[in-house]
Amino acid sequence: MRPGFRFSDGIEVESQINQYKRTDVFVCQQDAHKPFDHRVSVYHVLKEKGCYPHGCVSFLWKCARLNKGSSCHRGFRHVGRKCFGCRFFSDEKIIHRPQIVVSSERFEAFRRDLRAFETWLEGLRGREVNYSGTVFSVKPHVTIDPSCNGRLSFHGFLVVFHDGFVNLVHLHDFCYLRVSGRTQERYRFKPGDRVDFFARLGESRGRIILTRANRIELEEEREGPWWNESRARVAVRTGAFLDRQPEKCLNCEKGCLVDVRDRGGTDVSVHRRLFCLEGIRNPGLCPYVKTGDGFVNECGTQRFLKGKNTVTRSNGILFQVS
């Protein structure tokens, strides 16, 4: 069981983390998980795929002509559903089983904590709760539909909290408040703001989501820039998707996870891709670095590397002098 949260006056209350989003329990060697170093969340394994302990089945499609470097006689460049029935087409059945990366004792403790968390969550799902916490970041809430030419849709903002209280329970994990552009314009939420409000609690693919916020009180307001709808729409149009999800980018105020809604026939599958609001496709070239007060753009500062050559960064341009 997780230890409770103790206030300075000695009063102790229950403490919870989001067990669904833990990535220290399972790993899966499927290629789709390679961008995440094969770490998979508890929610993905137990709820979305249900692949523990029996695993999941996938099929590797192959083309005898394309594998040899020859061209397809039907003009296709990739193997797909239209290749079914072709004499050069074959598929290989592959079974992937998630692996447990903790000891048996820790896994049993995890299962107990998971049951306690789910009991707590189900008791609050769909109900109005009181939440109090400090804003960690504010991100535009964006979705993309590949069937509509990859159109990005703006749905307001996500006010992100990392530590707070749900009623009298200490939630030491991420929690997301969905607000409209008008609400964000009114309260100007920004990192560091101390907020108390009532909202309806729910869960979306493992995330704890708060909606329909009311009786909002800004107990402490920080100075600094804040997102508004016009600025967010410009960032959405000029941003860029990343192929991976580096920890630095996930925690950066310029990075946000976009819900991708793939429509295959009558089914709609949802996954998330990392989107950089600054339009930086290569995290290695990103000038933003984490500091105690947030992220700072290092453009215009000098950097020196050990060795024969000196590298200087000025206004985002690298100069090398032997």
Task: Identify the residue ranges that each predicted region occupies.
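Small-residue-enriched segments and motifs
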Residues: 133-136, 199, 252
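Short, solvent-exposed interaction modules
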Residues: 175-182, 250
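Beta-strand elements of well-folded, non-transmembrane domains
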Residues: 137-139, 163-167, 181, 201-203
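Short, charged beta-turn/beta-strand-edge "cap" motif at the junction between a beta-strand
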Residues: 198-209, 215
